[in-house]
Amino acid sequence: MYRALFNIFFRRLDAEFAHHLGALVISLAGLLPIPKRQKSVSVAGLAFINRIGMAAGFDKNAKLIRGLYRLGFGHVEIGTVTPRPQPGNDKPRLFRVPELNALINRMGFNNDGAIAIGQRLKRLRQQNSDLPVIGVNIGKNKLTELTQAPADYAFCARELAEYADYLAVNVSSPNTPGLRDLQQTESLRPILQTVKDNSSGKPIFVKISPDSSDQDLLDVAKLITELDLAGIIATNTTVSRPAGDQRELTETGGLSGRPLASRSKEVLILLRAALPGKVIISVGGIETAADVQERLSLGSDLVQGYTGFVYFGPGWARQLTRGE
């Protein structure tokens, strides 16, 4: 039903406009019954109703948490949130590649800023006792010099940790100039240390790029162990492109969805061996319950999706948890 509607209606709309329409529907989903609580899953000291989460980038401003929870997501990672509000990159900046069940985005961390989003999360928690696990993905503002990046991450941690269940440090988006340079350990160490110092003891994850070399990923894993952080989110979007003649593949930005699955699994296997006892959240190319089970069998503790939700619709998370 949804796939037919997607092909007839949503596919013809600008991808970002369609996203805003979908967000309106999801906000109404907040009126649906709360999902049935199965046996909770304990990860990083947090109780999840299931292992399926919404990846960062879908709910940038913490406006859809209740609706996504009622659609079956056990956790929602909002953001990326920066210290100051910013509009992001010029439009168009979101593109579908339906033949590949993929998206390309160059959004550029458009968000309302840490103070406004912190207040929104505060109100949400005051008004609702039953919520999913809420992760807050944090980053630096576009105009902040790389040498000043630790201060941006520290500011976000101070403003948001109180209302987050966990923090995710984003140093891997391809859409903020120079951001990926912060994955080098000499740059990453002060960022992670200052986030830890300002996190109120909340679990901290590092979101990494699939385009990093295996050695660079192992260096990040070593740093996570040294600083005793909770774990890693693998992976963000990729700047590589699969073979194909689709016009959208020429657009710049990060590619997500089915073409990312192979590299995402490679990174998962690599990091599971390097991070015994740490939490790994696997992201990238997950579409079916079989995909979820494969990631769990490879050592992931939780999984996240975004593009799969776009292509398979509002019932997707519940289908995954039912094993369909």
Which residue stretches match the model-derived regions?
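A gly/proline- and charged-residue-enriched helix-loop-helix capping module
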Residues: 79, 84-130
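Active-site glycine- and acidic-residue-rich loops that bind
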Residues: 141-153, 181, 206-225
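Glycine/Thr-rich beta-alpha phosphate-binding loop at enzyme active sites
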Residues: 23-31, 173-184, 220-278, 316
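Glycine-rich phosphate-binding active-site loops on the catalytic face of alpha/beta enzymes
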Residues: 74-86, 173, 231-239, 286, ...
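C-terminal helical cap(s) of enzyme catalytic domains, especially alpha/beta-barrels
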Residues: 85-101, 241-256, 302, 308-324
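An N-cap/entry alpha-helix motif that binds or orients negatively charged groups
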Residues: 1-42, 105-110, 114
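Catalytic cores of alpha/beta
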Residues: 61-68, 212-226, 273-275, 286-303
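Short beta-strand/loop segments at the ligand-binding rim of alpha/beta enzyme cores
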Residues: 45-53, 129-136, 198-212, 271-282
